UniProtKB/Swiss-Prot annotation:
Keywords: Cytoplasm, Endonuclease, Hydrolase, Magnesium, Metal-binding, Nuclease. It comes from Acidiphilium cryptum (strain JF-5). This is Ribonuclease H. Its main location: cytoplasm. SUPFAM superfamilies: Ribonuclease H-like. The lineage of its organism: Bacteria, Pseudomonadati, Pseudomonadota, Alphaproteobacteria, Acetobacterales.
Amino acid sequence: MASEPGGLVEIWTDGGCKPNPGAGGWAAVLRFGAAEREMSGAERETTNNRMELTAAAAALEALKRPCRVKLHTDSEYLRNGITRWHTGWVRRNWRNAQGDPVANYELWQRVLAAAKPHEIEWIWVRGHAGDPMNERVDQLATAAREAMLREPAETSTARR
């Protein structure tokens, strides 16, 4: 999604699995002024957290130039990882506070790389609490997961 330098892009993301771990879907809606773009995808074997990270990474990777971004997520894992935990992980060579390797390391790297050129405000919203855009991305992620489950087992999808 193209934007003017300094323009504000609003992004809503969601990811989920049923069961967790299991088949999962992710989705994002990007809004720049009156323009909107929906993105979604799914994987057969994944986790809620992996789908949340994938949604954020894919949305940020879709931006064609540096932007101001408000990214809305109902994932405390994503928001806390980006705003609080990742500096410690990097300092400890991608180990958590207990000394174990950080889960989903490659996806955290992808999110951080995609976020780097942008000025991002990470906004947590309560899931399933009636926020219209959060409900929309939840429905898109669920639809992506359900569509993938109707396909042959060797495929995963990414609809962009």
